[in-house]
């Protein structure tokens, strides 16, 4: 090159060279012979040049050269180099000095060392080539048209030797083939030694000494291989950025010189001498067919950098060059060339920015990505280059000085030894996610910045670790999506936790999504569909701009707040944006770490309550379970998310996946609606116990129901239907169960009082009914009952499933064994269910078809009454009949559990059974005492007609099934077990047990049991219908002899007794036998149980076999008394009239 003084006067330092961008690898053939044959210290004619440096002519005896064609001086004929040339260079190149020079300076060291004298000769030859003005004439001849086009070079003074320097400086703009070849060869010569680079020595002398990059004088190192010094300075520049150590700082002038040298060598890897020597073998191994020039060899080597067979020294050299590219994009020839017009078009290199900032690769990528995301057109060549370098940054963390600077501790502690193919970055991501320890805020910010720079959300292939881990999943689950499409990531998220997902892909995907979820711009599809809405509603700025008022993480929160607004609330999202917001919400529901706000506010609570919940989706469920225990900020976030889920349960992606079969079968209509509004969850709840329902779905639906109980806002439809009623009638009540109780109590009171206008609105009453029915299915949905009975459930119903109200049914069946508090709650529940049988989940489930058959139009409150009336129908389902009997048994334990009886006997109960009521407790059964009392009064025929009708039915039913008589069952349990075990074990009860007890009356020892059996006998006298065995035996006789006599009040029984005494009447043998048995029983009963009143006495007389004799005696007695009265007159003293009239 020309003397540096002239060049630096035009443009200080190596800044003169800023315009170079492109070059092609030189051909082996050199420029015109005159230039190529000139030797050190010689002119073009081969004569010694004036002013040649001492020793320029080379060693003694080598002057005047000859031996070349045309008699020109040849390097190959110099004695000091002849042996090296013959040994190292092919014979056809000996005649060409530049070819020999290229051969010798590309020698593999230290395998084939060149002699010291030859090295010195080469140095002087190269120095002359770069400083001798006589070479200018060759350049003017070869580059005539190029010089005319480049004004700066045309203006250089003639004969001063500055022209070659100028042409090297503008090599990228040279299009003339021969000129380009000549100048490229000159550049290769210059770049072989830093001292030959114009200005480099002056700019970097102090830095070379500071960084100890080697001697600046020829000596220990070969004079022509001083490219190692430049490599050392490059490493110093890189180290400065990575360590931020004030003791190791490269001066600004030298920094510019280093980057300019790297830029000038960007087109041909031969020009980076250190990299060339380090990677020659690897070039042959990996890039043998790659033509040199335009940075192609560099790119090829970059692509193979992490191959196992890549040498370590080459990998280090490539990494250093990549780090320089990261500091100045112009060090990449292909990137600078492909993106030149786009950078200018989108003002990515405006003058007012600091040079160090706009030159950074990250700034270029961010600026051009911003244009792409705004929908601007960036050339495909430039986008291709951007993709390559984004992939490069993701592949090797060491190319990002911020990562090394901020994450050094995390790398050493958690990620050592994972330097290849992006594994270190993913390891750091894993640490940030909290899976391998804690991470500093600076490291997290550096990672977030790198993810924004590389933008892997736009193309998954940028993340090599993810690409390799997920290749099989993409080929199977996402093969319908074009390779590189941003929707690939969404597709992978949709298949997260499915059988198609592989574990390694799952980890890499979640690690990347953690960062994408923290900056809405990194989700390309979301940004594309929502940038208008975000600008309008959330006041966001450009893609690569940030705002303190609206940080990236807050934008999505703003969007989803608007996504679920009603039309009345206004300012809603566009349909496309809303769909994307829902997609993101679905993804976030899979992992709590994908929701930045949730993880930030709930970090302490997650550690406190959910440290053991590591399975998919368990952390959010755990937070919901402990909602009342969470700190305020976390509780608000979880509450808002749960409220959102109640409106659109499809956000719960894992639940939706588990429930897919049931949705397709039973809920496809509501699932297809774009606006959910809680319909889908309601449908799932209603079909929770279908046989198609799988366990995962049922558990998920039940869990959501349990969460809903914590706050009525979590039931979207209930909230929307009743929020005004709640504010008016139930203020300050939060829990759903309390709101339901408050509203249902209000509705019941208004109904009982026949209020003209209900205080609870019609739409709320309808939804309230839905909520009440849903709560009956699982005891956990009734928190007060569940809390009261927890210990009893553990003791008695431990293996019983919660669903289908099975626990509630279990508690009902063992009611007598329950703790007092639980017993009371169960009694209250039964009282409610008997008043409104539709709330009896088990009854409604078991008898669903029978209700459709027998009670399609029955009011819900009369449902059980209707079923009881049809219980003995031939087409009644046995299971339903059994369930009706169970409810009848329950009703007969206490009149309060039989609303119809309670209403019919409203006046009779306090009149006849007050003493029992006085002993009664509100929450404890009377064990049938009131009903037994009413039965006795029924026998005395003293009840009101309505009450009598109800008691008759109860007597008839209990006569067929002893279990319907709680007093009998309680007092005669031992007798039934010992005397009537076979009858009690019968599947169908038809009065056999009662008959057995009557027959064995004499064997009964227990007084209370005997009394109950005697009461049965007494009841049977009142009406034959209450004695099923006798009624069955005498059915034909009643039809023949007593058809005209209406039933009731013992009339048909008296008719049969008269027929038995009438000799003219022949009764059926069975009937006659049963009647005689009854008479004997009644006779014994009369002896054992004396009449308690006149009515009992009269009944005993009427049913006695000596009825006529007794009546005759009574009549005679009365007549005798009458006659005595007539004959004996007054017994009292007579009184005079005067005394009477006083």
Curated annotation (Swiss-Prot):
Extracellular membrane side: 30-1108
Cellular compartments annotated: Golgi apparatus membrane; Golgi outpost; Cytoplasm, Cytoskeleton, Microtubule organizing center
Xref: InterPro entries: Cys-rich_GLG1_repeat, Cys-rich_GLG1_repeat_euk, GLG1
Glycan-modified residues: 128, 173, 544, 640, 749
Annotated segments matching region Disordered: 45-69
Keywords attached to this entry: Cytoplasm, Cytoskeleton, Glycoprotein, Golgi apparatus, Membrane, Repeat, Sialic acid, Signal, Transmembrane, Transmembrane helix
Signal peptide region: 1-29
Main location: Golgi
Cellular component annotations (GO), alphabetically ordered: extracellular matrix; Golgi membrane; microtubule organizing center
Low complexity bias (residue ranges): 45-60
BP-aspect Gene Ontology terms: bone morphogenesis; negative regulation of protein processing; negative regulation of transforming growth factor beta receptor signaling pathway; protein processing; regulation of chondrocyte differentiation; transforming growth factor beta receptor signaling pathway
Transmembrane segments: 1109-1129
Description of post-translational modifications: Fucosylation is essential for binding to E-selectin.
Topology term for the membrane: Single-pass type I membrane protein
Membrane topology, Cytoplasmic segments: 1130-1142
Cys-rich GLG1 repeats: 81-112, 113-175, 178-241, 249-309, 310-376, 377-436, 438-500, 501-567, 572-631, 633-691, 692-751, 759-819, 821-874, 875-942, 943-998, 1004-1064
Pfam families given in the database record: Cys_rich_FGFR (PF00839)
PANTHER family, per database record: GOLGI APPARATUS PROTEIN 1, SELECTIN LIGAND RELATED
Function text: Binds fibroblast growth factor and E-selectin (cell-adhesion lectin on endothelial cells mediating the binding of neutrophils). Binds fibroblast growth factor (FGF). May be involved in intracellular FGF trafficking and the regulation of cellular responses to FGFS.
Name listed for the protein in its UniProt record: Golgi apparatus protein 1
């Amino acid at each position: 090159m020309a003397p540096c003084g002239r060049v630096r006067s035009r443009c200080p330092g190596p800044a003169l060279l800023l315009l170079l961008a492109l070059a092609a690898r030189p051909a082996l053939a050199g420029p015109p012979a005159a230039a190529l044959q000139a030797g050190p210290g010689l002119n073009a004619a081969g004569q010694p040049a004036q002013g040649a440096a001492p020793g320029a002519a080379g060693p003694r005896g080598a002057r005047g050269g000859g031996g070349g064609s045309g008699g020109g001086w040849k390097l190959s004929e110099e004695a000091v180099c002849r042996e090296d040339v013959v040994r190292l260079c092919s014979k056809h190149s000996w005649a060409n000095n530049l070819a020999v020079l290229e051969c010798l300076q590309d020698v593999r060291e230290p395998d084939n060392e060149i002699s010291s004298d030859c090295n010195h000769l080469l140095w002087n030859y190269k120095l002359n080539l770069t400083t001798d003005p006589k070479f200018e004439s060759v350049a003017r001849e070869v580059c005539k048209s190029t010089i005319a086009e480049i004004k700066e070079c045309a203006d250089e003074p003639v004969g001063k030797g500055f022209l070659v320097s100028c042409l090297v400086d503008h090599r990228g703009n040279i299009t003339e083939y021969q000129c380009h070849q000549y100048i490229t060869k000159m550049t290769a010569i210059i770049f072989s030694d830093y001292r030959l680079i114009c200005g480099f020595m002056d700019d970097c002398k102090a830095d070379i000494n500071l960084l100890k990059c080697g001697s600046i004088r020829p000596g220990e190192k070969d004079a022509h291989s001083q490219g190692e010094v430049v490599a050392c300075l490059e490493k110093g520049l890189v180290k400065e950025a990575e360590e931020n150590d004030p003791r190791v700082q490269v001066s600004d002038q030298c920094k510019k010189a280093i980057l300019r040298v790297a830029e000038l060598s960007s087109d041909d890897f031969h020009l980076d001498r250190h990299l060339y020597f380090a990677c020659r073998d690897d070039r042959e191994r990996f890039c043998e067919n790659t033509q040199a020039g335009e940075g192609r060899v560099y790119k090829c080597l970059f692509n193979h950098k992490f191959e196992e067979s890549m040498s370590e020294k080459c990998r280090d050299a490539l990494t250093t060059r990549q780090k320089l590219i990261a500091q100045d994009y112009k060090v990449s020839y292909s990137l600078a060339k492909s993106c030149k017009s786009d950078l200018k078009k989108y003002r990515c290199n405006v003058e007012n920015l600091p040079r160090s900032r706009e030159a950074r690769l990250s700034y270029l990528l961010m600026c051009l990505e911003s244009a792409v995301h705004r929908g601007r057109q960036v050339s495909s060549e430039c986008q291709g280059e951007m993709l390559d370098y984004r992939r490069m940054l993701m592949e090797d963390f060491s190319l990002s000085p911020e990562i090394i600077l901020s994450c050094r501790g995390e790398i050493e502690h958690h990620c050592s030894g994972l330097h290849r193919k992006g594994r270190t970055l993913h390891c750091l991501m894993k640490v940030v996610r909290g899976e391998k320890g804690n991470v500093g805020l600076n490291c997290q910010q550096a990672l977030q910045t790198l993810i924004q720079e590389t933008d892997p959300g736009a193309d998954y292939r940028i993340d090599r670790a993810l690409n390799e881990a997920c290749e099989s999943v993409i080929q199977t689950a996402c093969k319908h999506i074009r390779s590189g499409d941003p929707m690939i990531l969404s597709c992978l998220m949709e298949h997260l936790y499915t059988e198609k997902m592989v574990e390694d892909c799952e980890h890499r995907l979640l690690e990347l999504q953690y960062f994408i979820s923290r900056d809405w711009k990194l989700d390309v599809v979301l940004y594309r569909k929502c940038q208008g809405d975000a600008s309008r509603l959330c006041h966001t700025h450009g893609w690569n701009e940030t705002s303190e008022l609206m940080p990236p993480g807050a934008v999505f929160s703003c969007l989803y707040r608007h996504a679920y607004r009603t039309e009345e609330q206004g300012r809603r999202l566009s349909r496309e944006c809303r769909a994307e917001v829902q997609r993101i919400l679905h993804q976030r529901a899979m992992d709590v770490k994908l929701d930045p706000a949730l993880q930030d506010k709930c970090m302490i609570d997650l550690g406190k309550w959910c440290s053991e919940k590591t399975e998919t989706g368990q952390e959010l469920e755990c937070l919901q379970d402990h909602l009342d225990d969470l700190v305020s900020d976390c509780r608000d976030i979880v509450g808002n998310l749960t409220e959102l889920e109640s409106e659109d349960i499809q956000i719960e992606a894992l639940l939706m996946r588990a429930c897919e079969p049931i949705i397709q079968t039973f809920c496809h209509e509501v699932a297809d609606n774009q606006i959910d509004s809680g319909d889908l969850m309601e449908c799932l709840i209603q079909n929770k116990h279908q046989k198609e329902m799988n366990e995962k779905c049922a558990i998920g639906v039940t869990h959501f129901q349990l969460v809903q109980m914590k706050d009525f806002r979590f039931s979207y439809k209930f909230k929307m239907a009743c929020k005004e009623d709640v504010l008016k009638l139930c203020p300050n009540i939060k829990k759903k169960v309390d709101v339901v109780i408050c509203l249902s109590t209000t509705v019941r009171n208004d109904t009982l009082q026949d209020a003209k206008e209900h205080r609870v609105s019609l739409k709320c009453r309808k939804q309230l009914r839905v909520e009440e029915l849903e709560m009956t299915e699982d005891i956990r949905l009734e928190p007060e009952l569940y809390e009261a009975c927890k210990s009893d459930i553990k003791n008695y119903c431990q293996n019983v499933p919660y669903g289908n109200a099975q626990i509630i049914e279990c508690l009902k069946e063992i009611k007598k064994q329950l703790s007092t508090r639980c017993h009371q709650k169960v009694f209250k529940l039964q009282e409610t269910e008997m008043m409104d049988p539709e709330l009896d989940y088990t009854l409604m489930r078991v008898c669903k078809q029978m209700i459709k058959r027998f009670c399609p139009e029955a009011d819900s409150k009369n449902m059980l009454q209707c079923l009881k009336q049809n219980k003995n129908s031939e087409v009644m389902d046995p299971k339903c009949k059994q369930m009706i009997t169970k409810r009848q048994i329950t009703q007969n334990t206490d009149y309060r559990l039989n609303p119809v009886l309670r209403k019919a006997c409203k006046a009779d109960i306090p009149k006849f059974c007050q003493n029992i009521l006085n002993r009664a407790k509100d929450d404890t059964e009377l064990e049938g005492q009131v009903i037994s009392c009413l039965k006795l009064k029924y026998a005395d025929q003293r009840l009101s007609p309505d009450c009598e009708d109800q008691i008759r039915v109860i007597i008839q039913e209990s006569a067929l099934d002893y279990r319907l008589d709680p007093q009998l069952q309680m007092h005669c349990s031992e007798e039934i077990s010992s005397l009537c075990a076979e009858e009690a074990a019968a599947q169908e009860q038809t009065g056999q047990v009662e008959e057995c007890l009557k027959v064995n009356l004499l064997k009964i020892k227990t007084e209370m049991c005997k009394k109950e059996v005697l009461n049965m006998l007494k009841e049977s006298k009142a009406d034959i219908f209450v004695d099923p065995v006798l009624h069955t035996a005498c059915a034909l006789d009643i039809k023949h002899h007593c058809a005209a006599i209406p039933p009731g009040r013992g009339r048909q029984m008296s008719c049969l007794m008269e027929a038995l005494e009438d000799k003219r009447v022949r009764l059926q043998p069975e009937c006659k036998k049963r009647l005689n048995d009854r008479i004997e029983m009644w006779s014994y009963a009369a002896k054992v149980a004396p009449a308690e009143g006149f009515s009992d006495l009269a009944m005993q007389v009427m049913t006695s076999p000596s009825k006529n004799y007794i009546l005759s005696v009574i009549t005679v007695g009365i007549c005798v008394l009458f006659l005595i009265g007539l004959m004996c007159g007054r017994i009292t003293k007579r009184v005079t009239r005067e005394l009477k009239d006083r």
